[in-house]
Swiss-Prot record:
Pathway: Cofactor biosynthesis; riboflavin biosynthesis; 2-hydroxy-3-oxobutyl phosphate from D-ribulose 5-phosphate: step 1/1
Organism: Proteus mirabilis (strain HI4320)
Organism domain of life: Bacteria
A cellular component term, taken from the record's GO annotations: cytosol
NCBIfam families according to UniProt: ribB
EC number per UniProt: 4.1.99.12
Protein name: 3,4-dihydroxy-2-butanone 4-phosphate synthase
PANTHER family reported for this sequence: 3,4-DIHYDROXY-2-BUTANONE 4-PHOSPHATE SYNTHASE, GTP CYCLOHYDROLASE II-RELATED
């Protein structure tokens, strides 16, 4: 059903291209996963271009759980322990301990403060002491290999940032409806049109990456 709903956004490969163009222009994109998986739409932004307004929109229209997606290398660089040793969550979502910027924030909750935290975590020369633990931003560690290894929003966000030419750090937040329920594909499409955001699926991104690797090979 998702593919039919999304046909107005172009073919699967066109949807990825449009998403990459939007990210390069400093906009956000909506990423849907499989209807048989979480069946959720996440707002995704590149960490290094995200604005306070975009963070505020994520908090206002999202679940409130703002996540910064990072690689294993960056997790080690920041010395962030995983939230639990034995991950029993359904999709093995790889949360680390939560973080707060050590400088430049007040309570850490506002959109500006959360963006400051994201920027501190994304800085090239970021070090463990730049972040306090716990905090109000939730790092997620992506699997090496991206969506070709794990078809999750975390990996999709890192892949999109990288393919768009940015460092592999991205911000995501699940879109929710006004009544607090999770937004599914029809609501995601409506929201995306209202906010001029492209929509793509993780399936689209897998197809795009496989095509790119085939061309490279």
């Amino acid at each position: 059903m998702n593919q039919t709903l999304l046909s107005e956004f172009g073919s699967p490969l066109e949807r990825v291209e449009r998403a990459l163009e939007a990210l390069r222009a400093g906009k956000g994109v909506m990423v849907l996963d499989d209807e048989n998986r979480e069946n959720e739409g996440d707002m995704v932004f590149v960490a290094e271009t995200m604005t306070t307004e975009q963070m505020a929109m994520s908090i206002r229209h999202g679940s409130g759980i703002v996540c910064v997606c990072i690689t294993e290398e960056r997790r080690q660089q920041l010395d962030l322990p995983m939230m639990v040793e034995n991950n029993t969550s359904h999709f093995h979502t790889a949360f680390t301990v939560t973080i707060e910027a050590a400088q430049g924030v007040t309570t850490g909750v506002s959109a500006a403060d959360r963006l400051t935290t994201v920027r501190a975590a994304a800085a090239d020369n970021a070090k463990p002491s730049d972040l306090n633990r716990p905090g109000h931003v939730f790092p997620l560690r992506a699997q090496p290999g991206g969506v070709l290894t794990r078809g999750g929003h975390t990996e999709a966000s890192i892949d999109l940032a990288t393919l768009a030419g940015f460092k592999p750090v991205a911000v995501l937040c699940e879109l929710t409806n006004d009544d607090g329920t999770m937004a599914r594909a029809p609501e995601v499409v409506t929201f995306a049109k209202q906010h001029d955001m492209p929509v793509l699926t993780i399936e689209d991104l897998v197809a795009y990456r496989l095509r790119e690797e085939k061309k490279a090979g």
